[in-house]
Amino acid sequence: MRIVFAGTPEFAAEHLKALLDSPYEIVAVYTQPDRPAGRGQKLMPSAVKALAVAHDIPVFQPQTLRNADAQAELAALKPDLMVVVAYGLILPQAVLDIPRLGCINSHASLLPRWRGAAPIQRAVEAGDAESGVTVMRMEAGLDTGPMLLKVVTPISADDTGGTLHDRLAEMGPPAVVQAIAGLADGSLQGEVQDDALATYAHKLNKDEARIDWSRPAVELERLIRAFNPWPVCHSTLDGESVKVLAANLSTGKGAPGEILSASKDGLVVACGDQALSLTRLQLPGGKALSFSDLFNSRREKFAAGKVLGQ
């Protein structure tokens, strides 16, 4: 079977690795154009491109797949199937119709819940009990196609966006390989999604990461976990930015953002409802530290009565 793979970030690269170890032929890889990254803003290839180059697989990086030339280039590859994972470009119907068996997608949620760009973080933020990967046939709509296969994992009370991402990146690739086998032998039939159950996972926005201490503590605790390792929740103290990487639910009352107490166990801050104990912070110019380490060296900065977010 001739497969064209389309994907961009590390999550997608894990799927490409599994396909490279499978009996299927990867005839080409599509990925986003190289982007500036790092302090020097040097053009860097995507994780998928780097892997493809290392395996001498032809790489295509069109700005769009909506024009006839790009579509003809894809058709010339004569793909039996296109596997799409976090590619970042919309595929028009003309592209979906090119492969003999169509296009399939590995999506990091239990569809139809959390269609869209940030399903992993939105599941943690919402307090969902479980997440997973759905392999589906692609349609022109956003994550709307018939579902071929699902794998499920519980979301634990200490899962972050990062830990859930890594777990799903391990679960998704074998599911895709299994789905391809089912398509090849005709044993796998798609299940139509119930649009009434659909929710949308909006793209992450850095502005969302600014902590609004008037919100309930339970919501903020989930947000802090969801946005770790990116974009990372933050607030201000004494005019300086403070990144908050971990927190636990606590008790106490005060003005939103008010420091209620500080100890080696954590920095207790009042929220709109109850309080949070901040257990891992990062100050400007420093690395992320447990609050017990910060408390030993910067105790005066975290005096009770000070207010975060002002």
Swiss-Prot record:
Instruction: Note whether Repeat occurs among the keywords.
Output: no
Q: Which family does it belong to?
A: Belongs to the Fmt family.
State the InterPro entries in the record. Fmt (IPR005794), Formyl_trans_C (IPR005793), Formyl_trans_C_sf (IPR037022), Formyl_transf_N (IPR002376), Formyl_transf_N_sf (IPR036477), Formyl_transferase-like_C_sf (IPR011034), GART_AS (IPR001555), Met-tRNA-FMT_C (IPR044135)
Function in brief: Attaches a formyl group to the free amino group of methionyl-tRNA(fMet). The formyl group appears to play a dual role in the initiator identity of N-formylmethionyl-tRNA by promoting its recognition by IF2 and preventing the misappropriation of this tRNA by the elongation apparatus.
What is the superkingdom listed in this entry's lineage?
Bacteria
Identify this protein by name: Methionyl-tRNA formyltransferase
Q: Provide this UniProt record's keywords sorted from A to Z.
A: Protein biosynthesis, Transferase
User: Which Gene Ontology cellular-component terms appear in the entry?
Assistant: cytosol
Q: Name one GO molecular function term.
A: methionyl-tRNA formyltransferase activity
**Annotated NCBIfam families:** fmt
